[in-house]
Every structure is written in C-alpha cells, then in structure tokens.
UniProtKB/Swiss-Prot annotation:
The keyword Acyltransferase applies. Homotrimer. InterPro entries: Hexapep (IPR001451), Hexapep_transf_CS (IPR018357), LpxD (IPR007691), Trimer_LpxA-like_sf (IPR011004), UDP_GlcNAc_AcTrfase_non-rep (IPR020573). It catalyses: a UDP-3-O-[(3R)-3-hydroxyacyl]-alpha-D-glucosamine + a (3R)-hydroxyacyl-[ACP] = a UDP-2-N,3-O-bis[(3R)-3-hydroxyacyl]-alpha-D-glucosamine + holo-[ACP] + H(+). This is UDP-3-O-acylglucosamine N-acyltransferase. Keywords: Acyltransferase, Lipid A biosynthesis, Lipid biosynthesis, Lipid metabolism, Repeat, Transferase.
C-alpha cells in the first residue's frame, strides 16, 4: 500500500524549513535522476549536484547552501542523508504483521509470548523463551529454550536462535541468520580433536541489525556480546566470546576469530579478517580485505595488502616480492663492500 504524505507534514516531522506548497502530496522516494512529480528526493553527495536542476522530483531534501538558486520545492535540513533515512520509514512497503500466533506455530507451554507479539507460520518457540510486545517472529523461525527477545524486535523468516540467546529492544535480524550456534572449540590430544562444550550464550543489545546468513556463535564459557546499535551486514562470522562495542558497523564477509574484542564506533569494511585474542580500540576504521593480526591501540584508519592495479603490473610486483629475501642479502653484501672502501666504514642504507 502506497503512503501519501503532505510536504508540510514532512517538514514538521523533520523540523525542516519548507520552500514550496505544504499541500503538495508525496507518495514515495527516489533518486534525483529517477524521481517523478510525486516523489521526494535528496542531495547528500556533491557529485550528484549536476542532476539537481533537471530533476523532476516533487521536492528535494537539501542543505541551505544547495537550496540557494534552486527553483523547485525543497525541505532545507542540516543533513539531507539523515533526513532521508528518517523519512524512508514512512514509505517502507514492508508488510506489518498482525499480532497473534499463527495456528501452525508450535509454542511451548511455559514460553511467554506477549499478546501484542506476532508469531508466524510454522515458527517454533521452545521452553522458557520470552517474547515481548511488538516483536515479529517470521515464518519458520526457531526460538530456542530460554531465549529472550525485547520489545519491537523483527525477525525475518527462517531466523534461528539457539538456546540462551538474549536480545534487546528494536533488534532486526534478517533471514538465514544463526545466533548462538556452537563455537569452534576443540582440544587436540595426540592428533585427535576433542570437542569442548560451548556453555556460554549470546547477549545482543538494543537497536542492533544483523544481516542475511550472518552467524554469531555462543560463548565457550562467558557470553558472546554484541553492543547497542551495532550493525552487521550479510554473511559475517562472529566467533565465540567475541565482544563488539556500541555502534560499531561491519560490511559483508567480515570474519572475527574467537575472544577478540572490538571497541565502540569502529567500522570494518568488506572482507576484513581478524585473528583471535586481540583488542581493537574505539574509533578504528579498517579498509576492505585487511587482515588484522595484532591488537590496535590507537584510533585511525588501517589497511593491509596491495591495492588493485593492472594484472600485468601486479604479476611483475608479485614476482619481485618472491625475490625480496635475495635482494636484501645482495644489498647487505653491497653495503659491506662499499663500507670497506668508504672513509669511516659507514655505507649502510640506513646511514
């Protein structure tokens, strides 16, 4: 169902300065290039300013500087991208689940499901689980024993929570995510791997989002902990006993080994890997495909590996890398020979 909201109502909702008719009706959102005469757009990135003049949008979210000289209707705000984020929820077409339990769902007798929660078809809620008001549990979800889901959470179809997972309020978990699976713990005795029972749980804070097919393993002893406001993209692996600080965000395919601690307000780009038992301080940005092998104690941006280059150049560089040891030995020999004939005997490349 398409929402229709007047421009004046949007201005009031955002606390924006309205330039244009408050009665103009907005039915959706679109980019500057694609917006039609009933859609709202926004300009947040300067590289798209070239599309502003010819945009057919009904109105545009703009900073004050960009609004100068713009002839169309506008909502003037300090941060157009943040304003767009807030408005997007007003036009979200995602179906709203009705409260109640689907007849095909299986609910343990001692599970507590608030009447204002929604439990979808073929969902399973095991013994001792507690589901708060406003929670949506999608079709075919599994909620293990003694799990807790705080108010207004949303679980897409086919989410799995193993036993003893505690989730805060307003948490979003996408399809295929598995929370509380057994951590990868084994003791080796004479070449034979002996399984270690993973007796901890998972603790997830408020306002967390977890993407499609992401795995958060339960702790070996203490809980694996995901802080408030953490955002995890698709296909991320969080190993046992990992701790992630508040408002840290990770892009797809990040892998974090066991017992690593990540601070608050960090950003990990796609494909980052971290070894186990290290600490990452607050306010760290790690670029894509970086391999983190030791603790980071200072805020800032960190990278590893080589940047993209034409394949022929990369092959030459790779060949030279294999020769580095030999080149270092030859350089040392040359330094020694030059040092033998240099006054003072100092021919080091460091001198």
């Amino acid at each position: 169902m398409t929402a229709t909201i007047k421009l004046g109502e949007l201005a009031e909702f955002l606390g924006a300065t309205l330039r244009g008719s408050p009665e103009k009706e907005i039915t959706g959102l679109a980019t500057l290039q694609e917006a039609g005469p009933a859609q709202l757009s926004f300009l947040a990135n300067p590289q798209y300013r070239k599309y502003l003049v010819d945009s057919q949008a009904a109105a545009v979210l703009l900073k004050a500087a960009d609004a100068e000289g713009f002839a169309g209707d506008a909502l003037v705000v300090a941060d157009p991208y943040l304003a767009y984020a807030r408005v997007s929820h007003l036009f979200d077409p995602k179906p709203k689940a009705a409260a109640g339990v689907h007849p095909s769902a299986v609910i343990a007798d001692d599970a507590q499901v608030d009447p204002a929660a929604s439990i979808g078809a073929f969902a399973v809620v095991e013994s001792g689980a507690r589901i708060a008001a406003g929670v949506t549990v999608g079709a075919h979800c599994f909620i293990g024993a003694r799990c807790e889901i705080g108010a207004d959470g949303w679980l897409a179809p086919r989410v799995t929570l193993y036993h003893d997972v505690r989730i805060g309020e307003r948490v979003v978990i996408q399809s295929g995510a598995v929370i509380g699976g057994e951590g990868f713990g084994f003791a080796n005795a004479k070449g034979i791997w002996n399984k270690i029972a993973q007796v901890g749980g998972v603790l997830i804070g408020d306002d967390v989002e977890i993407g499609v097919n992401t795995a958060v393993d339960r702790g070996a002893l203490a809980d694996t902990v995901i802080g408030n406001g953490v955002k995890l993209d698709n296909q991320i692996q969080i190993a046992h006993n990992v701790q992630i600080g508040d408002h840290t965000a990770m892009a797809a395919c990040v892998g974090i080994s066991g017992s690593t601690k990540i601070g608050k307000h960090c950003m990990l780009a796609g494909g980052v890997g971290l070894v186990g038992h290290i600490d990452i301080c607050d306010n760290v940005f790690i670029t894509g495909m970086t391999m983190v092998t030791h603790s980071i104690t200072e805020p800032g941006a960190y990278s590893s590996g080589t940047a993209m280059q034409p394949a022929a150049e990369w092959r030459k560089s790779a060949a030279r890398l294999r020769q580095l040891d030999d080149m270092a030995r030859r350089l040392k020999q040359l330094e020694k020979r030059v040092g033998d004939v240099t006054p003072g005997g100092n021919a080091s490349s460091e001198g």
